[in-house]
């Protein structure tokens, strides 16, 4: 029997490392830093950091963040990307941390921050699920493209091969594309929310490449 356990951005890696969780399926970026602690299967999604703002906000790009307040979720790569961007471009925005994505959105909704920086696909989901989606906008170019992958314990090549073979099987058979269309390009019950998110070129390419290459 397969058991499930909810994890957070902060505890997902420790729970894999200590054996509490065998496999983590979520919005987890496969990068070189994390690969020192855990292993990753074949990349199954690609996304980039963008900004969620209130509709009508003057913020249209990261350059508009100068001197403003920005929130992101603690323990995510997005938080690190924004911190580096702030220093590299000398934007002098105040970067705030929130415990999870809904809290980050609430901080912007309450006017305590001007923008929420996060993976664009997660922002599309939060916007679509909001009480009034028209009150929100996802803006700016993606700051970087990062792959998502299933995270599992390090130094267990047999288990990684099992997970890789399973993901590769879905991609080779065409089942992966059917699942993508169902969840990202069709109305989802019970509310009928449609993310209307086209498949990225990076993901299309990886359906053939079957790569587990990390982000830098």
Task: Label the model's feature ranges.
Residues 1, 68-69, 76, 124, ...:
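Extended ligand-binding regions for polar small-molecule ligands
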Residues 1, 28-29, 46-105, 120-124:
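Bilobed "Venus flytrap"/periplasmic-binding protein-like clamshell domains
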Residues 2-64, 142, 204-214:
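Acidic, polar ligand-binding/catalytic clefts
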Residues 3-14, 95-107, 144-146:
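Short helix-initiation/N-cap motifs at beta->coil->alpha
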Residues 11, 26-36, 81-86, 109-110, ...:
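A ligand-binding cleft/hinge motif common to bilobed small-molecule-binding domains
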Residues 16-17, 65, 108-109, 150, ...:
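Hydrophobic residues within well-ordered alpha-helices
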Residues 77-95, 135-136, 167-215:
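Ligand-binding clefts/hinges and TM-proximal coupling segments of bilobed small-molecule sensing domains
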């Amino acid at each position: 029997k397969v058991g499930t356990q909810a994890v957070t951005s902060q505890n997902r890696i420790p729970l894999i490392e200590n054996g509490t969780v065998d496999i983590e399926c979520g919005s987890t970026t496969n990068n070189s830093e994390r690969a020192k602690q855990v292993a990753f299967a074949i990349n199954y999604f690609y996304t980039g950091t963008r900004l969620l703002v209130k509709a009508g906000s003057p913020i249209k790009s990261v350059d508009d963040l100068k001197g403003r307040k920005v929130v992101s979720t603690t323990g995510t790569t997005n938080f690190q990307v924004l911190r580096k961007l702030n220093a590299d471009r000398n934007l002098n925005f105040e970067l705030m941390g929130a415990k999870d994505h809904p809290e980050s959105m609430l901080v912007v909704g309450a006017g305590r921050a001007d923008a929420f920086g996060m993976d664009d696909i997660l922002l599309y989901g939060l916007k679509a699920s909001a009480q009034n989606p028209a009150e929100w906008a996802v803006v700016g170019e993606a700051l970087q493209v990062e792959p998502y992958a299933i995270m599992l314990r390090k130094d267990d090549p047999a288990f990684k091969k099992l997970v890789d073979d399973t993901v590769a099987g879905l991609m080779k058979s065409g089942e992966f594309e059917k699942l993508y269309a169902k969840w990202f390009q069709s109305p989802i019950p019970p509310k009928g929310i449609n993310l209307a998110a086209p498949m990225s070129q990076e993901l299309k390419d990886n359906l053939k490449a079957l790569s587990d290459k990390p982000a830098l």
